[in-house]
């Protein structure tokens, strides 16, 4: 499968899971906890995979997509974003599930993630599609 499409598919999953959390009653802490665990695991695995496979290759072939000056800038910014998402994700776990403070922390994580997804889709993925062959995109 094309790595850029795989990344986009995972982005859609992340957005859907955040939306599902928003639609669950605060009293249903079991469902909220299960969804949050699933989402947090996806966020962590997604960031780790991008840092291990996608961004190292982008650094070699990219030139900067759209409003990014270089592939190095895209990569550096993405890793900073991933760290911000990790930190805001960890902050969620410091609050009682279903509490107002828990939902606020989930919202902060959602914002950090949403900002990152938009930037990555506009910059890194565009840059990669322009410079990687379809074969390479499938091999990764």
Describe each PLM feature range.
Residues 1-140:
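Small-residue-biased structural context
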């Amino acid at each position: 499968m094309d790595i850029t499409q795989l990344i986009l598919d995972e982005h859609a999953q992340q957005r859907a899971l955040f939306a599902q959390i928003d639609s669950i009653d605060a009293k249903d802490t079991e469902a909220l906890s299960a969804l949050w665990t699933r989402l947090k695991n996806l966020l962590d695995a997604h960031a780790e995979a991008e840092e291990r496979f996608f961004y190292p290759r982008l650094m070699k072939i990219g030139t900067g997509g759209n409003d990014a000056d270089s592939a190095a800038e895209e990569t550096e910014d993405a890793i900073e974003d991933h760290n911000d998402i990790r930190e805001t994700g960890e902050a969620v776990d410091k609050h009682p599930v279903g509490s107002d403070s828990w939902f606020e922390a989930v919202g902060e994580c959602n914002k950090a993630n949403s900002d990152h997804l938009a930037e990555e889709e506009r910059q890194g993925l565009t840059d990669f599609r322009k410079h990687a062959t379809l074969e390479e995109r499938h091999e990764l």
